[in-house]
Amino acid sequence: MEARVMTPFTYFSLPMQKQFLANQQAVQGKPYAEFFRSKISVPLSAVEKIQQGPMPLADTLTPSIEDLNRMLAADFISEEAGYALLPGPMAYVQSRKFFPNCTAEMLKWWFMWHPLEAERYTLWFPYAHVENPCVHHERLSDTTLSFEESLYGNTFCASEYVGDRLMHLHIHFRDPCELGFCPDLYRESKIDGSVSALMSLAHEPQVPVSLMAHLFKECPEGLYLTSRYWVGSHPAMQRFPGAERAAQLLEESGLGEVELETLAYEFAVHDMCEFNHLASILPSLHAQFSGAK
């Protein structure tokens, strides 16, 4: 088992504190209410990485096809946490999270199970998550479909706090190779699953303002989830239809260069909290509610 020092994460914006209280009330009476927990623990090493401030640009990846595929290289090991502002402007977040005693099947199950009720989504990050309905929700519970058939080409409509900003987002999941990953490299890297996506603001769903790469791979003690977030405008995003409008749309939405750098920091904190918290509850939650023997 990987040796890690975990520390409580205790600072949440006032809107997030109020959202926690609302979520706490809403989850009462649900069979999974015991998994709604106020304590969020994160790796101390990840906190210390984020506290160092923005990363040097030389250590970042862009959303280019070339940089995406660097994530699949045999010698690629992601840093645990970090954020930066790329030219564009574009918010950048990187992370690598360890899920002890978890399997790829557990994480796939989570993405099929949690969007079916808003209260399930709040288990993931009780202070930040509001709801995450799925456009084609019937596909999530269709046992004749594979995980990939259920998720890819489907859209989650997430409402969540990132810092003190309530964001309404459409997360358009795609086959990773449609996003730029090389099929041969993806196969050779033995990735166990991807929940990668394009993301748009809810009021302009045809304008991708973000690319998210989430790749997970099992190890003897559990699994690792390696993630990259790019939010904003960048020449490499032009391969996605509508992305040429991203800079103007974000500026109109109050996300200029200064705000995007703040968003990068807040997304780094959000990612650290939500996925480490999910890792702490997923094995028991899956055992109780998946129906798996």
Swiss-Prot record:
InterPro entries, per the entry: DAPG_hydrolase
Transmembrane parts of this sequence: none
EC primary class: hydrolase
Catalytic function, reaction form: 2,4-diacetylphloroglucinol + H2O = 2-acetylphloroglucinol + acetate
Enzyme Commission number: 3.7.1.24
Requisite cofactors: Zn(2+)
Induction: Expression is positively regulated by GacS and negatively regulated by RsmE.
Binding locations of Zn(2+): 129, 160, 270, 274
Keywords: Hydrolase, Metal-binding, Zinc
Gene deletion effect: Deletion of the gene slows down but does not eliminate degradation of DAPG. Deletion does not alter the ability of the bacterium to colonise plants or promote plant growth.
GO molecular function: hydrolase activity; metal ion binding
Pfam families from the UniProt entry: DAPG_hydrolase
Task performed by this protein: Hydrolase that specifically degrades the potent antimicrobial compound 2,4-diacetylphloroglucinol (DAPG) to equimolar amounts of mildly toxic monoacetylphloroglucinol (MAPG) and acetate.
Protein family: Belongs to the DAPG/phloretin hydrolase family.
Record's protein name: 2,4-diacetylphloroglucinol hydrolase
Lineage: Bacteria, Pseudomonadati, Pseudomonadota, Gammaproteobacteria, Pseudomonadales
